[in-house]
Regions:
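Hydrophobic, aromatic-rich alpha-helical transmembrane segments
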Residues: 31, 35, 40-47, 68-76, ...
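Hydrophobic positions within alpha-helical membrane elements
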Residues: 47, 92, 100-103, 107, ...
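Short, intrinsically disordered terminal tails adjacent to the first/last structured region
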Residues: 1-15
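Membrane-embedded alpha-helical segments that form the functional core of polytopic membrane enzymes
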Residues: 54-97, 107, 131-139, 145-159
């Protein structure tokens, strides 16, 4: 006798590969939830992976300099907000480029674009908004940091295409 397993359909508006009851599902206004899910705000590990090296570098620079200032706190906050926004922009870009693939994979079919929660146009607008906000934050940094951040966009842009080989 064949054993069949049934994977339950995800709840309306949720993403099947995210933890249930996350902060986006519990606290975010309903109209923002698909966009926050598109940015993977319900899964903070990617933001931490961007943010912790930034904070570590800042801490080392402050120790080397021997003093801290209020400006350093703004840089710490700017790194946090920038990491959140750029991680979100990268995930949004990934979902835009993989939209035709995601719809045919059970793990990703419930993501906002293939499930119809967000249109491609809406996702592009969300991507531009996140990038513009992050760029505004980037302007508080020096030219060397700005150049490094701009250079880091290359792997983000090609990543969705590189994983197809």
């Amino acid at each position: 006798m064949a054993v069949t397993t049934h994977t339950p359909e995800p709840q309306e508006g949720t993403v099947s590969d995210a933890v249930r009851g996350n902060w986006v599902d519990r606290y975010a206004p309903p109209a923002t939830r698909p966009y926050l899910r598109l940015s993977r705000a319900d899964r903070p590990i990617g933001t931490w992976l961007l943010l912790l090296p930034c904070w570590w570098g800042l801490a080392l620079a402050m120790v080397y300099d021997g003093q801290a200032s209020w400006h350093d706190l703004w840089i710490f906050a700017g790194c946090a907000i920038g990491a959140f926004l750029m991680r979100g922009a990268g995930c949004t870009w990934n979902d835009i480029t993989d939209r035709n693939i995601d719809g045919s994979v059970s793990r990703t079919a419930s993501r906002p674009i293939p499930s119809g929660q967000v249109s491609v146009t809406g996702a592009l607008i969300w991507l531009v908004l996140q990038a513009l906000l992050a760029f505004g934050i980037l302007l508080i940094f020096n030219l060397a940091a700005i150049a490094l951040c701009v250079l880091s966009l290359l792997p983000v842009c090609i990543s969705p295409f590189a994983k197809r080989f």
